[in-house]
Amino acid sequence: LMSATSTVPTANPTAQAFEIRPLPGSVGAEIIGLDLSRGVNDQDFARIHRAHLDHHVVVFRDQRITPEQQIAFSRRFGVLQIHVLKQFLLANHPEILIVSNIIENGQSIGLGDAGKFWHSDLSYKELPSLGSMLHAQELPSEGGDTLFADMHKAWDQLPEHLRKAVDGRHAAHSYTARYSETKFEGNWRPTLTPEQLAQVAEVVHPIVRTHPETGRKALFVSEGFTTRIIGLPEDESRDLLAQLYAHSVLPEN
């Protein structure tokens, strides 16, 4: 369970000695020797931010942080976005979404099937998120893995005929794209209220986005939230998206 103490990082944290080690494979790095509960000064955060830009996924080993500390560190990256499923937000800390398959008194305490499909978090919003910060509390001995794919690399290695097919095109993204499908497979998805549906109205984004800091291009489609390619017949859109999805999750990505 997550602690609810009021401890927060100090206003002027001291520098910490830590190491950034790339993980095996095409994405990810682990940070060894950093204690997030002590707070992170600007110089140390600059290194973390650079690691995130370079490796896309950053793992902080052996952390013992409170919800307040997690929120405070998350805010270093930008304004936090509140998830639409308010039923599963942590009490008194709406910035944190509970992801759990635990049932208490016949009710799910969290979103139990998050990440069933490949997706980019909050791509269904007008302003997609920079990323998400996951804080593991209780894990199974095996299974339950979270997988990542490098969409920069997916674009870099996209065959030329597919590059031409998506050049300048946009795609629609919707939170409800596969919501009913997952809802009927398990008791994890509550029925959305009209207010919640209004918060996740369909949006349109370029199929290829350019990172504002690095200038690198990346594919921006996913089977979880992308519904169609604007301006293409339904069958052509479905076929092209299927090819993009398959390419995006090749082992080398």
What is each PLM-predicted segment?
Residues 3-253:
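Non-heme Fe(II) oxygenase catalytic core, chiefly the N-lobe of the double-stranded beta-helix
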